[in-house]
Amino acid sequence: MASSGFSGDETAPFFGFLGAAAALVFSCMGAAYGTAKSGVGVASMGVMRPELVMKSIVPVVMAGVLGIYGLIIAVIISTGINPKAKSYYLFDGYAHLSSGLACGLAGLSAGMAIGIVGDAGVRANAQQPKLFVGMILILIFAEALALYGLIVGIILSSRAGQSRAE
């Protein structure tokens, strides 16, 4: 069988950078949605009970943290891509792409959950203060989804560079 001379390794950095972009873009989309959705709830609740605004800002902060998770993975991936210094194979590019997608999509889904729960939670908290602890617990479980994506993203990005013995 004749070799075409194209191994695919020339395109590997594209997939690596695509993974970095996916991590940041999807995580920030989740953070933006969560911040906006829960922020609307805080604003409408603040009209009725202005003394609870600072207490109800928790979902907005938790949603903002999701963007940091994407930034962490994007930095890890982008520092691992240097085809001039060392060989960067297609396996490495795919490992970085899957790392970015795992973190980014987990951050997106967590942001949607935090936004919806935060919006409903702060509005309900204005009427029944006993619901605050329950809201926080649900928000923690939603944030854990993004943490799972961050952990898997770190594991997958650490696999890059293990494709061939050098």
From Swiss-Prot:
Main location: membrane
Alphabetized SUPFAM superfamilies for the sequence: F1F0 ATP synthase subunit C (SSF81333)
Function: Proton-conducting pore forming subunit of the membrane integral V0 complex of vacuolar ATPase. V-ATPase is responsible for acidifying a variety of intracellular compartments in eukaryotic cells.
Subcellular location: Vacuole membrane
Membrane topology: Multi-pass membrane protein
Site (Essential for proton translocation): E143
Annotated transmembrane regions: 14-34, 57-77, 97-118, 131-156
Pfam family, one: ATP-synt_C
Subunit-structure text: V-ATPase is a heteromultimeric enzyme composed of a peripheral catalytic V1 complex (components A to H) attached to an integral membrane V0 proton pore complex (components: a, c, c'', d and e). The proteolipid components c and c'' are present as a hexameric ring that forms the proton-conducting pore. Interacts with APD2.
Keywords: Hydrogen ion transport, Ion transport, Membrane, Transmembrane, Transmembrane helix, Transport, Vacuole
Cytoplasmic topological segments: 35-56, 119-130
Molecular function GO terms recorded: proton-transporting ATPase activity, rotational mechanism
Disulfide-bond pairs as recorded: none
UniProt topological domain (Lumenal) ranges: 1-13, 78-96, 157-166
Family named by the database record: Belongs to the V-ATPase proteolipid subunit family.
Listed CDD domains: ATP-synt_Vo_c_ATP6C_rpt1 (cd18175), ATP-synt_Vo_c_ATP6C_rpt2 (cd18176)
GO CC annotations, alphabetized: proton-transporting V-type ATPase, V0 domain; vacuolar membrane
Full protein name: V-type proton ATPase subunit c4
